[in-house]
Amino acid sequence: MNDTEQRLEHLLHQFDVRLVETGALTPRMNACWHPLSRTIYARHGLDPVTRVCAVAHELGHAYHNHDCSTPDNEREADEWAANQLLDDGLVEEAAWECDSEPVAMAAELGVTMHLLRTWERLYRIGRTRHVSACGLSLS
């Protein structure tokens, strides 16, 4: 289990959320949050990066007490997930190692491009977790 997966396990326990892998979700749905049972259902067979990001996103719904999918709720869940999985220190290190190439950075960080772009947007408006002072631009 890598550091990101360990972080997710900790968050699942912290929020008293159960994770169930299932073959019942369609290919269009990687995971879903069921608030009544406090369960995240993740589609069986997801690649590790997609699984981590999908579960973190669904934990964002749990954190915000969402009970339905709206554009605002989806954005909030994405933002929460980005801030849980990334911080400026991690992104700065990946930028150095990957010559600021976004696809390589996402791979190095173990997140989807969507999550990295979400984090970048939050960084630009000052809404990210800070570990170090860095000036990043993920063009």
Model-derived features: where do they sit?
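Active-site hotspot residues in diverse enzymes, especially metal/ion-binding acidic/histidine motifs
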Residues: 1-139
